[in-house]
Amino acid sequence: MAGKVTVAFFMFAMIAFLANFGYVECNPAIATGYDPMEICIENCAQCKKMLGAWFEGPLCAESCIKFKGKLIPECEDFASIAPFLNKL
């Protein structure tokens, strides 16, 4: 008797899992919403921490405000941070 209940429960769980398999999305940025300007300024701060005196953080933050967060800098992408680097 217990074996039949276990098998029935297992089958129900598998059917429920397979029925919902294609509908699950795990993207917290979309689920909670995000502000591109906030991400832009946070990335400027992160790049400043990583690159120190070689990175012009205030200039980066000003560009975030000027372009309303449309040009988000990526610290590991030279093309996106090139305008904010100085030669020392």
From Swiss-Prot:
The name of this protein is Eclosion hormone
The question of whether Ribonucleoprotein is a record keyword is answered with no
Query: Where found?
Result: Secreted
Pfam families (UniProt xref): Eclosion
> What InterPro entries does the entry give?
Eclosion (IPR006825)
Function according to Swiss-Prot or TrEMBL:
Neuropeptide that triggers the performance of ecdysis behaviors at the end of a molt. It triggers adult behavior patterns: larval, pupal and adult ecdysis, and plasticization during the molt.
Q: Where is the signal peptide?
A: 1-26
Q: Name one GO cellular component term.
A: extracellular region
Q: Report the record's disulfide bonds.
A: C40-C64, C44-C60, C47-C75
Q: Name one GO biological process term.
A: ecdysis, chitin-based cuticle
The record's GO molecular-function terms, alphabetically, read: ecdysis-triggering hormone activity
Which organism is this protein's natural source?
Manduca sexta
Recite the UniProt keywords alphabetically.
Disulfide bond, Hormone, Neuropeptide, Secreted, Signal
Q: Which family does it belong to?
A: Belongs to the insect eclosion hormone family.
